[in-house]
Amino acid sequence: METNPFPPPSAELLQKIEDLNAGLVSLKTLAGAVSQSEVRSLAETEDGVRLTFCDGTEVTVACNAAAEAPLIGIAVDGDAYYWTLAAEKDIPWLKDAAGAKMPVSGPVPVVGRDDKGFWTVTTDAAVTPWQIEDGSGNPVEATGDEQVELFRSVKAGNGRVEIALTDGGTLSAAQVNDLSVAGTANCYVVSAPGTYVFNARVRGNGAGEGVGFEPAIEMADGMTADWLWTDSEGLVSGVALDTTSGDIFLTVGEGRGNALVALMQDGKVVWSWHVWVTDAPQTMTYGNGTVFMDRNLGAAGTTAGGTDAYGMYYQWGRKDPFYGGEKTETSANAFLEAKNGTVVNPAYPALDWAFSKSATTTDGAAANPMTFYNDKVGTGYNWLASPNATLWGEAKTLNDPCPPGYRVPGTGAWEDLISGRQYIDGVSVWDGTNYGMTYTHGEQTAWYPAQGYRNYSSGAIVGLRSSTGGSGAYWSAETSSVKSYYLFFRSKLSSSGSINNELDMNRSYGYTVRCCKE
């Protein structure tokens, strides 16, 4: 029996062949994706870095920063990528059976080893593989020492993702930041300029029964996306809807502030989202273990005594913010601060800051996110015609206004700030100079501005800091009959109480919100 002079491939070589073929599939997918779409997210996995593109393409690449030039790579010729024989410098192109260059846009080459020990390639399982030849036309021996890793690193920065190849080349793609990668919500925090995307197919976090909405939003003809208002001109731009993916894209510029972005159908609001542009909020663990955000929802900062610490106002159970402002208003000039402090999109004249003496439905509130509702006769000073105690809850709901990972707190979250309706020396302290309250636990201190509130009767801002001290009113998620509980504090008084977390009030008031961790 004649003996084959060529030994069979080792297990190590067979594994290299398998790894190389898997890498070639990934490389082809990447080469196509970077030219057609943006990177939506990056994630470290056990198998490598998973890149998700906005068109839905997902690729996982295994990287080796120390890897050298591989057996096969890619290079640009004209306006297209072609497969290369990386070991060859003068004639780098990997050739097909007819001797022509092989475009990356075509079939993926499948690499193997023939029974004589040479590298082979084919593009179809039904086609007999041919030997890979070097620049002199000689077959390339599969020694087992070849480098088969194709990716050196994946790095993101300045709005781009750079994928370094081991053959010295680079694939580059624009990157958008996926705001909903950690979960969907009615508010998203943005801390740097750039292009962003979020999932517009889900209302809020998609949870909570009895809130009056279906969690899912079905894309339909006539749908678009746009901004409705911003308190910093040019803060958001390029708002657009991809009806295929159901994603909303937007560009955030320099500065800090707030904006409301909406999914529209035939000029009417289907759902809206609060884009909150601020330094990345920090957290503080209170004495009872509740983890709070370090600022009011919608605030640009945390400066004691500074208006940057003022957040937005919210009617209880509604997800959409009402502009805060820095001055007290009267019923005659209610929302003057909002009109002077924000830019409203002129493309939608029916959508502007307004007060309505009539109650509405949850659908009506969602369709008119800039209208402050109150029916003081028919509903017990509620904005909702049929009061609903499930719109917010200690389990985050679809209508909760906080960003992913946060929710409106329960009233018990503030229990260690209070003793007998009074401040606690060294723990919760009224600051009469900066008009607000500090809460200290351990080495951390939180600032609560006395930001007042929007009155139920007109929507006017009242209770802001003044010579009489001002007051703070912060909603909780808990309810009492047709009212809801809130945290209230004011200048230190000898009687009648200075701070209380067990007061309940009509849900049509516009109070501030301090989000806590879910």
Where in the sequence are the language-model features?
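Residue-level detector of short, conserved catalytic/binding motifs and their immediate flanks
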Residues: 49, 81, 117, 161, ...
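Short acidic-hydrophobic surface loop/beta-edge motif
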Residues: 51, 163, 282-287, 434-444
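Collagen/collagen-like triple-helix sequence repeat recognition
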Residues: 1-179
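Short, well-ordered strand-loop elements centered on a beta-strand within folded domains, enriched
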Residues: 81-89, 120-128, 165, 269-274, ...
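C-terminal, surface-exposed recognition/capping segments
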Residues: 170, 299, 378-518
